[in-house]
């Protein structure tokens, strides 16, 4: 209902503007829409825009998005060079750009920065359907008229402008999916787009999309401090091992409205609106077996026996809703030689997780005397651990022996709002030393407020008289692991049990609110030489932020902090033309990434040392410096009819990287701490990389009429250095895949348009398991470094154009059924193994 109200409000607004339109006889020539028909044409359109840009940018244009089997924005951008994607439930979620993780990149919608529904700065992109977008532009170099935020780069999503329409547009799309694991075909996805220039001076485009998708997935994993080594050098399981089963329905709904009004030949106004909602309705079962008391004589390179095994059967049910909404109003006009643009934006993101229960039941086998064992674990296949229970552990197979261990009701509400005003001025009639020059200058003010309110209620004591047998234990019927020991409490019955604990008392221990204001000024000149274009200038941003929270959740113990800092960033982008087809690029620019909100927020548990005005404990660090990067780019580009080749090299020198650390005898936020577990700027990092891109229409070179190929790869190397009391430690740069590659082979002729797309990403350091401990002063335990294994996927798209208006489409995703694998330090030490299966999609499209 609320989305219907939104729609009616927007359509009413559209009608109001239309009815108030000027009746002047002045007419403006319409801008013809660039129509890209077929996969090959749309790829060439993106390359043409890339060639014309004065920056290093990769572009996915219009219909090219629909020609990949990519449901979300994250999966679409993974096709570009320098981009890798972190997956969740088999779908792309966070984008890593040139080794920079999601929180170190800027994400914008039609020029307005997009806030993050989660607690940090990284924007999850698996909830943004590609049907709402017209193009995606990934900027790898920045100019002074762009925000400095994002040491990796800037990802810009754009919706279609009504002024680009030459005639009315009406499109329908309907798809359904089949997944190997869910076995369900009830996965509808439909979208609708309508747009028109209703008069010579007013046009509007409306888009709507909805998808409901059933997902079944399985994984097995081991926890932190997972593997030990015996005296013979054999590894053995030193912690818990668990199998997980996920059954969820993922629903996406979104709409866009774009309106353009040309008031006069040199004055126009526009309005952009985007709303996107993402709902996860999830049931998760966890079958966990904690190994203790290893029989040392039984340890081999692939197995070990244990005399104590604790079994936990955990069931979780939650409904999580995320929303992103952007509202933009702007315009442009001219006063003589001065061109003026303004933009006002209001962006909002929210994550609501207030329907969440987690229940755990426990049983145990323990041999206190004698030689009996509870069971033997085997890791001959490091990706699948297997357990054989001994007769002494028969209770672990009996649901009636499982008693209540934990019952938690979690809740959370994260809200993030950013308001911004942007003013840009431009004069094209300048000359400097007889060289034409465009002078630009501007100002931007933005204010951002983010709050985090999370907590939980422990109901274990109240539920303790009941055991699992009281909650109708059952075994999931789509359990695909080689081993099945699982029986679990009915999640619906557990979900109903939470009602006796509501309403919940507010838990303030994790509450914080941060306000951030940024004032930015820039000056930029574009020089147009006979054989070169040079864009040079400087941007300065001043940041002021304040944050507050409660020490250990005590409403009477408020912690307030504030801080101001500035950053000045010169930049230069040069494009030099060797001939009509060949150009060279070079650029230098500075950028920053502000600390994460959770890293600076006063999520605190601190206490005074016996009236000494000295404190100890744990807290965020409001004194953190932002990441700062100096960036260099050089590239060679060749564009010919039906053939494109580019090669580039980039380098990033990064200061003030942020990691967890325990500090001693330091003042943080005006408070002196004898010991504080917090975050700190530690050491420096650097990244060096090469990017190669190739596009060829094969019928120009081979007797392969209608065939084409596209290939890109990024080879990079990066590291982070830490100076500690035990010396200097060097590790790979976090989230950086040293090798990324995409290969597309396609056929586009007549009524058939098909493409096979291959995506490869090498392994990368996921995170340090030591985080939150004395990471830098006690040194690294390299066995606790988690890596994400390499990933290779095959996707197939085939479209048949039945008529000018009607087409049919088939998509196959993850056709090789490639799993996601994570390991501790070496690939034979399991951390996590996920399987999602392949997905097939069938659909119809109608346009008028």
Language-model features and meaning:
Residues 308-326, 506-519, 563, 592-654, ...:
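Outer-membrane beta-barrel signature, preferentially recognizing the C-terminal barrel domain
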Residues 112-140, 192:
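Short acidic/polar hinge/loop motifs at secondary-structure boundaries
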Residues 35-66, 94, 102-105, 112:
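N-terminal periplasmic "start-of-domain" segments of outer-membrane beta-barrel proteins
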Residues 182-291, 312, 320-330, 336, ...:
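Transmembrane beta-barrel wall of Gram-negative outer-membrane proteins
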Residues 74-113:
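Extracytoplasmic beta-strand/coil segments of soluble accessory domains associated
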Residues 699, 760-775, 799-848:
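C-terminal beta-signal and adjacent terminal beta-strands/loops
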Residues 651-654, 665, 671-770, 816:
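Gram-negative outer-membrane beta-barrel transporters
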Residues 73-76, 93-96, 108, 124, ...:
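N-terminal periplasmic accessory domains that precede
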């Amino acid at each position: 209902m609320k989305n219907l109200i939104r729609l009616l409000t927007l359509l009413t607004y559209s009608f109001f503007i239309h009815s108030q339109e000027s009746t002047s006889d002045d007419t403006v020539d319409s801008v013809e829409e660039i129509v890209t028909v077929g996969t090959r044409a749309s790829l060439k359109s993106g390359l043409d825009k890339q060639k014309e840009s004065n920056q290093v940018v990769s572009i996915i244009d219009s219909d090219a998005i629909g020609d990949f089997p990519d449901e979300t924005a994250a999966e679409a951008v993974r096709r570009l060079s320098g981009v890798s994607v972190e997956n969740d439930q088999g779908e792309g979620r966070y984008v890593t750009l040139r080794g920079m993780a999601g929180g170190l990149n800027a994400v914008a919608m039609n020029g307005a920065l997009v806030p993050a529904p989660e607690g940090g700065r990284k924007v999850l992109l698996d909830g943004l359907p590609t049907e709402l977008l017209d193009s995606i532009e990934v900027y790898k170099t920045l100019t002074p008229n762009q925000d400095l935020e994002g040491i990796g780069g800037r990802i810009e999503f754009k919706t279609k402008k009504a002024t680009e329409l030459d005639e009315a547009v009406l499109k329908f799309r309907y798809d359904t999916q089949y997944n190997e694991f869910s076995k369900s075909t009830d996965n509808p996805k439909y979208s609708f787009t309508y747009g028109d220039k209703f008069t010579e001076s007013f046009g509007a485009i409306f888009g709507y999309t909805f998808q409901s998708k059933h997902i079944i997935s399985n994984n097995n994993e081991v926890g932190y401090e997972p593997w030990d080594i015996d005296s013979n050098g054999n590894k053995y399981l030193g912690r818990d091992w668990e199998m997980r089963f996920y059954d969820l329905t993922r629903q996406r709904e979104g709409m866009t409205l774009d309106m353009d009004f040309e008031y006069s030949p040199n004055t126009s106004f526009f309005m952009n609106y985007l709303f996107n909602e993402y709902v996860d309705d999830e049931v998760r079962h966890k079958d966990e077996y904690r190994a203790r008391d290893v029989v040392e004589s039984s340890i081999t390179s692939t197995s070990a026996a244990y005399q104590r095994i604790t079994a936990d059967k955990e069931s979780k049910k939650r409904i999580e809703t995320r929303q992103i909404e952007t509202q933009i109003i702007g315009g442009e006009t001219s006063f003589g030689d001065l061109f003026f643009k303004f933009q006002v934006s209001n962006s909002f993101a929210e994550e609501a997780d207030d329907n969440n229960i987690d229940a755990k039941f426990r049983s145990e086998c323990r041999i206190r005397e004698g030689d009996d064992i509870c069971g033997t674990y085997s890791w001959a296949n490091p990706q699948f651990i297997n357990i054989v229970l001994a007769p002494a552990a028969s209770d672990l197979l009996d649901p009636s022996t499982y008693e209540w261990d934990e019952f938690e009701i979690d809740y959370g509400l994260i809200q993030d709002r950013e308001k911004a005003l942007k003013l840009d001025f431009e004069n094209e009639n300048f000359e400097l030393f007889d060289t034409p020059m465009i002078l630009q200058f501007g100002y931007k003010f933005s204010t951002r407020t983010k709050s985090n309110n999370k907590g939980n209620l422990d109901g274990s004591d109240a539920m303790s008289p009941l055991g699992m047998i009281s909650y109708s234990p059952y075994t999931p019927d789509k359990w695909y692991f080689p081993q099945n020991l699982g029986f679990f409490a009915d999640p619906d019955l557990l979900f109903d049990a939470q009602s006796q604990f509501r309403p919940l008392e507010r838990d303030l221990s994790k509450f914080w609110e941060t306000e951030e204001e940024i004032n930015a000024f820039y000056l930029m000149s574009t020089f147009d030489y006979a054989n070169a274009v040079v864009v040079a200038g400087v941007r300065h941003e001043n940041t002021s932020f304040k944050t507050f929270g409660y020490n250990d959740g005590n409403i009477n113990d408020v912690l307030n902090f504030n801080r101001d800092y500035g950053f000045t960033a010169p930049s230069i982008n040069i494009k030099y033309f060797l001939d009509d087809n060949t150009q060279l690029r070079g650029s230098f620019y500075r950028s920053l990434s502000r600390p994460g909100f959770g890293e600076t927020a006063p999520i605190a548990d601190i206490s005074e040392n016996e009236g000494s005005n000295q404190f100890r404990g744990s807290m965020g660090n409001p004194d953190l410096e932002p990441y700062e990067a100096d960036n260099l780019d050089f590239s060679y580009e060749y564009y010919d009819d039906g053939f494109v080749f580019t090669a580039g090299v980039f380098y990033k020198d990064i200061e003030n990287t942020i990691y967890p650390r325990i500090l001693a005898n330091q003042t943080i936020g005006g408070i002196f701490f004898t010991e504080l577990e917090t975050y700190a700027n530690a050491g420096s990092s650097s990244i060096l990389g090469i990017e190669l891109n190739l596009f060829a229409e094969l019928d120009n070179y081979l007797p392969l009429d209608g065939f084409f190929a596209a290939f890109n790869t990024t080879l990079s190397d990066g590291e982070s250095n830490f100076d500690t009391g035990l010396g200097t430690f060097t590790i790979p740069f976090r989230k950086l895949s040293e090798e990324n590659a995409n290969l597309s082979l396609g056929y586009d002729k007549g009524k058939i348009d098909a493409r096979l797309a291959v995506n490869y990403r090498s392994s990368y350091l996921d995170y340090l398991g030591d985080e939150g401990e004395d990471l830098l002063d006690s040194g690294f335990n390299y066995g606790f470094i988690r890596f994400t294994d390499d990933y290779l996927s095959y996707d197939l798209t085939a479209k048949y154009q039945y008529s000018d208006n009607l087409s049919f489409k088939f998509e196959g995703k993850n056709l090789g059924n490639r799993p996601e694998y994570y390991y501790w330090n070496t690939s034979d030490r399991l951390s996590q193994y996920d399987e999602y299966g392949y997905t097939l999609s069938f659909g119809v499209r109608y346009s008028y």
